[in-house]
Amino acid sequence: MKSILLTLMVFSGLIVFADDKNEASQSLNPILIDVRTYAEWNDGHIETAIHIPLEKISNTIEGVIKDKDQVIYLYCRSGNRSGQAEIALKSIGYVNAKNIGGIKEVSTNLLLKILKD
């Protein structure tokens, strides 16, 4: 049941009604961010993710993602740090930041591979 809810939550963020095609296309392409440490990232990360460690996310995000309406999916090892990242991003205006859990859960539910460097 938990995986069904996560899948529904993730894909519900993909449905957008917008007049501006650019705005719609941005929202249709969520950005996946891994907020774990560099060592954890190097041990394996989701294939489409970008890496911004939790301790740097508040100071780095605006240089990476300008549009504060962009859908952002956050993950870590268990979902704890990605939950903290969601709170931090929402506090600076990223209204569509979503904690989607831990790396194994995300990989399984989104059918994405874990790559090792």
What are these regions (language model features)?
Residues 75:
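Short, surface-exposed ligand- or partner-binding patches at beta-edge/loop junctions that are enriched
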Residues 2-4, 16-30, 38-70, 80-117:
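Rhodanese-like catalytic fold shared by cysteine-dependent sulfurtransferases
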Residues 6-10:
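Hydrophobic helical h-region of N-terminal Sec-dependent signal peptides
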